[in-house]
């Protein structure tokens, strides 16, 4: 067992990019993805805010998803870019705690928000006459507020524990951000009790919401199958397939990473999987929701036409 480090409290993030041409290529690719995510999510938020036809619970939830994704990727990538450009892979003890807190908060909030969006589609398709009551503005705000509060409390508990455990002399985190499970490998104490709480937390905030989402869309698909209108059936299938694509792309790598015991995990595999839910998903969400949505594309076309008409 290693000795405690009494002189330095900084961590070292080993990162994702090797110092080679391949590393430069991966860095450039991720930086471009980051820019696309910023532009896409900001555009989605502004579009929903500006177009009065999109002022509905469904699009309000979608704007919150874009807001979460915008902050989510901004919590991770700027530090990666700085480390690669300046060759400084260190992160302060406090900085690591802050990054971990925001990552966990945004990750859980997105999962809960996706569950709310699934419930919204379930009510809209299965109980259309009850929709204004079940998904009122007040209910919508409560779901969003609840998602943020629950995720913040959960994140605070995990981050405080991670910052309070004693760490060994080696402070090199084999990851590209301060991921709590990766930090636990550096601990100079037995963390099996905490690892059990991580498994429990992952089950509560990953497996249970995904089960709820699957049940909601199962009911939706059954209701859609019974529809007489071909146009309505096509629109409902399009909406559901869009949401299921987002959910699967987000939950699958996340659950596979956090629900597995440490003995079955590898740092390289964890880093690759983390790219999906921290970098790719925030970039893909606005693209998937806009390209498969006639209302969003129509609103985007109107905004572009207004901009060009003003310039003319």
Swiss-Prot record:
Alphabetized UniProt keyword annotations: Cell membrane, Disulfide bond, G-protein coupled receptor, Glycoprotein, Membrane, Olfaction, Receptor, Sensory transduction, Transducer, Transmembrane, Transmembrane helix
Transmembrane segments: 25-48, 57-78, 100-119, 139-157, 195-218, 236-258, 272-291
Entry-listed glycosylation sites: 5, 88
Subcellular location: Cell membrane
GO biological process, one term: detection of chemical stimulus involved in sensory perception of smell
Membrane topology field: Multi-pass membrane protein
Protein name according to UniProt: Olfactory receptor 2L2
GO cellular component: plasma membrane
Job of this protein: Odorant receptor.
CDD domains: 7tmA_OR2T-like
Cited Gene3D superfamilies: Rhodopsin 7-helix transmembrane proteins (1.20.1070.10)
Sequence ranges on the Cytoplasmic membrane side: 49-56, 120-138, 219-235, 292-312
Extracellular side: 1-24, 79-99, 158-194, 259-271
Keyword Heme in annotation: no
Domain of life: Eukaryota
UniProt GO MF annotations: G protein-coupled receptor activity; olfactory receptor activity
Covalent S-S links between cysteines: 96-188
The gene coding this protein: OR2L2
One Pfam entry name: 7tm_4
Annotated family: Belongs to the G-protein coupled receptor 1 family.
Record organism: Homo sapiens
Origin organism lineage: Eukaryota, Metazoa, Chordata, Craniata, Vertebrata
PROSITE patterns named in the record: G_PROTEIN_RECEP_F1_1, G_PROTEIN_RECEP_F1_2
């Amino acid at each position: 067992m290693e000795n405690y480090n009494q002189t330095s409290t900084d961590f070292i993030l080993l990162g994702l990019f090797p110092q080679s041409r391949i590393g430069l290529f991966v860095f450039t690719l991720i930086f471009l993805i980051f820019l696309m995510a910023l532009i896409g999510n900001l555009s989605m938020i502004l579009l929903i805010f500006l177009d009065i036809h999109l002022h509905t619970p469904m699009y309000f939830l979608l704007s919150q998803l874009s807001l979460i994704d915008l902050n989510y990727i901004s919590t991770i990538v700027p530090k990666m870019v700085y480390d690669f450009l300046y060759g400084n892979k260190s992160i302060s003890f406090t900085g690591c705690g802050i990054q971990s807190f925001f990552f966990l908060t945004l990750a859980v909030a997105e999962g809960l928000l996706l569950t709310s969006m699934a419930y919204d589609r379930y009510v809209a398709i299965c109980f259309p006459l009850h929709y204004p009551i079940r998904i009122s503005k007040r209910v919508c705000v409560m779901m969003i507020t609840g998602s943020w509060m629950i995720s913040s409390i959960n994140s605070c508990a995990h981050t405080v524990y991670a910052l309070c455990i004693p760490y060994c002399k080696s402070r090199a985190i084999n990851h590209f951000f301060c991921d709590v499970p990766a930090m636990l490998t550096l601990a100079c104490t037995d963390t099996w009790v905490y690892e059990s709480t991580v498994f429990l937390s992952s089950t509560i905030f990953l497996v249970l919401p995904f089960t709820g989402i699957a049940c909601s869309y199962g009911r939706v698909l059954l209701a859609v199958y019974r529809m007489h209108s071909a146009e309505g059936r096509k629109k409902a299938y399009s909406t559901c397939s869009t949401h299921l694509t987002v959910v699967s792309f987000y939950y699958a790598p996340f659950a596979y990473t956090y629900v597995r015991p440490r003995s079955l995990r590898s740092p390289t595999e964890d880093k690759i999987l983390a790219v999906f839910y921290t970098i790719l998903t925030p970039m893909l969400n606005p693209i998937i929701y806009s390209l498969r949505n006639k209302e969003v594309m129509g609103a985007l076309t109107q905004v572009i036409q207004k901009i060009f008409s003003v310039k003319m």
